[in-house]
Amino acid sequence: MQEEVRRLAEDARRERNWKRWGPYLAARQWGTVREDYSAAGTSWDYFPHDHARSRAYRWGEDGLLGVTDRECRLCFGLALWNGRDIILKERPFGLSGTEGNHGEDLKECYFFLDSTPTHSYMKALYKYPQAAFPYTRLVQESLRRTAADPEFELADAGVFDGGRYFDVFVEYAKAAPDDLLVRITAANRGPDAAALHLLPGLWFRNTWAWGRGGEEYAPKPSLRLTPERGVIADHATLGRFHLLAGRGPDGSAPRWLFTENETNMGRLFGAPSASPFVKDAFHEFLVNGRVEAVNPAGVGTKAAAHYALEIPAGGAVELRLRLCVGEGGAAAGAAAEAPDAEAALGAAFEAVFLERIREADEYYAATLEAALTDAERTVARQAAAGLLWSKQFYGYVVREWLEGDPAQPAAPPGRSQGRNHEWFHLHNRDVVSMPDTWEYPWYAAWDLAFHMIPFARLDPVFAREQLVLFLREWYMHPNGQLPAYEWALSDVNPPVHAWACWRVYKLTGPRGGRDRLFLERTFQKLLLNFTWWVNRKDLHGRNLFTGGFLGLDNIGVFDRSRPLPTGGHLEQADATAWMAFYCTTMLAMALELADGDAAYEDVASKFFEHFVAISDAMNCLGGTGLWDDQDGFYYDQLHVDGRHIPLRVRSMVGLIPLFACEVLEQEVLDRLPGFSRRLRWFLENRGDLAGHVAYMDSAGGNGRVRRLLAVPSRERLERVLRYMLDEREFLSPHGIRSLSRVHRDHPYEFNTPDGAHRVAYDPGESTTGLFGGNSNWRGPVWFPVNYLLVEALERYHYFYGDTLTVECPTGSGRRMTLAGVAHEISSRLTSLFLPAAGGRRPCHGADPRFASDPHWRDLVWFYEYFHGDDGRGAGASHQTGWTALVLSLLEGQARRRGGAAKDTGQPTGPGGRKGRT
């Protein structure tokens, strides 16, 4: 058995706590809702970046490429100073939502290079300029620019020109679950020798200053310096740990600095601080030369080893540290028994790193598809690394947050009825997969569902645990709603959680060997969520749904999360289609569970009939439902003053109806007599519903009979696909656009008493301020919906087979089966990350460094979305996150090249796993 597989098994059985330590330290805690105690809910202003170095956080911690335990009690991270910066670099910098010309925006260059699922080995890279970091210029230039202008990035300031920067590599390797080895390599890429102050640090999250008791609020812990054993960290629930620091390249020991993780009240508020030694002491010591800022007694709750380095041109230095359990902790490791730091950081240290790197390579060699090319494997490995590095401790207890803390100033009046007050039950204190480590350091429920598809390949147990977690009673609302994200927990995201549960169930074992208990647990709780949707979002009981913005931010004519300026209401093609998709997914889950428990046959019948009712409403209610027969497309409909007005915007809203597609196999139905009887009765007695669209048609193949449940009939499917596969409309060189390119020359306008509302093709960053302006669904390519389209097309092909071919691209004369179309879209999506002519990856735009510089060209960012014409990445740059779905797409392509999907004709899905096996 591979060592990493063994570690995963030991952790799953709770025999050894291999996942106790990981990259769970946030990249940004400032500017978040959970740190906001303002009266107006102005999170960015209440806790800005300028406060972060001086102010203790209430709900978490942040740092630079750091680690922490799963409860974020003890943290380790880097701090850097080049002798020129105005502040000590302790965390990544970026613009707030009000500073960026497209909303919040990271202004750093760091990359996640490797990680195993247990974090037994991790590697990341931070590129640190040798010139003064241009904090002020980045803010001022971004404020000067409009939403129509490109963003001003760190590289645009010239700080990487001539190679005048440091590549700072951080590696972690576990000798044992509580024995973490740290290797830091700083390489000078410039032509001259340059100074670098490097401060690896250890600190406790402040849980003692709030006046609360209970399991989350242990007594104040301590760090203290010992001559032989480095820093000793004592914590009431974590136990005792040692941090050992090796000598610098000149043979000298680092200078240890100590302070308290307490707010500098004097600097921020003109009030006395709880301690003379405060959070920003190391900044004051280095940048401002205030020696008295650090505690000479060598005690505190925050410590750092200060290395003052001079690195020659083209040279590199290596530093070694080790965080290990000590006496007072369980099962002290070899490092704790070593006579001194040098022994613990010597040959055995090097051997552990060599072993863990070898094991990581072995794990991915066995886990990733063998047919991946070297270029594809580079992308896949970094996508996996980004996904694993994006696990973060997330703490947020709404009741305590609304009340305020006993030892802090009283909460502002009205806070008890402010943001998220309906979620008084929410009690989050978990490691959760984040959309992006800096721009979105808070969970988003529908993002997380997509994360779990590639996660199921890497760590099936974690994938299942995350999906169950969001259905537990301390997350899910008592009424059945899932929490959206901290900015507005009651916002409505697309109902994809059931799909993720079903896909993860199928991906994590062969038929007969899957986790049926997981499927039952999630199905039972999803029934509550489905009922919430039906009761809250089907306003008139007609099976046509509203839902708000549904994660697609600015895609609509109106801000769909607010009351309409016209009055009336909106029946949304996407909301209704999402519910049809929800029905088919729950039907598939119920049929699986019914094969072994007949009680589920009744609920399977319920979801079958509910799907048919929704599909009928979408296609036929009032004549043609939300279908526009003139255009051959699905549109939102505005209902006002007795009129039904289609909003003729060709967008992803009209493609989402394709997602709802499920094939019923006769051999499955034969094992379910109760469901089959009800199905026969329905077909024979409800001809008004069963006979008017093609989704009830039968198809044969190899003697098998199948039935297709889908929203569009075959004829309507073909009409929609003509738009979707037209390069003048949706089909881009790198996937399916979120808005048709036809709206570039023909914007859609709708006039209301408050003015004209206009939707135009906008292929890159948003040129409007809707939803903060940092997201855009009016043209760019987005991975989650593209992934679902690819899956749906493979299911349609499973039913129609070679009897249905379409032109791809439209007008080209080249005909493909729907499986061929799915593979074409998948190939276009993965091409975003693969080197093309001249070594350029489309996702990196025109930046020549990423094409030809040996220190940049193999590095990949996984952006939030991609320019609808040229594929340039936009939005968040570390969205692994759902853009890690590229890992599943690459694997699917590799399997097809290897011929593994040719035997049965069953859909493999983009990740290469057979659909209903």
What residue ranges belong to the model's regions?
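Acidic, mature catalytic/reactive cores of soluble proteins
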Residues: M1-R58, L64, L74, W81-T917
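Active-site-proximal polar cores
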Residues: T68
